[in-house]
Amino acid sequence: MLKASNTSIEEAMRLFNGAGVATGLLVPTETGCRKSIMDATLSFRDFLHESGIHEYSNQSQGPANKVIVPARFVLPDKCVATTASLYRPCTKKGDPRIWFSKLTHYCKPTDLLAVISYGGDMYVFNMSNKEITNAFGIPGSYPHDILSACE
């Protein structure tokens, strides 16, 4: 799904790799953006595991087994609190999924979302939003200060 990104993955990763920050990437499809649901790809599952956030391989299928994780959408001037639901549905062999509450307010289909873990929360950066990517270079902005705190 990453190949559908409307933004250069290499440029986005340069920011996080330069800071030594582990990052998971997601690219919502039109349906995924509309429903706020995305497949948790293998590379994203690896990020969640390595960050100590979640291990899908230990999770049973069905709504009773979903795990809710605090998350934040990062904007240049603020963070918007939300939640991420990590689950394996009863259908489709239980392929791992992630659902962010209010995702439709934060991105468009094919936007590149970079996710980091900090202080037990998931921070979501829309790397297709130039206001957000430009803010990484501005001390005092949320993207800059969060990334600096993670170094």
What are these regions (language model features)?
Residues 1-151:
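Intrinsically disordered, charged low-complexity linkers and terminal tails
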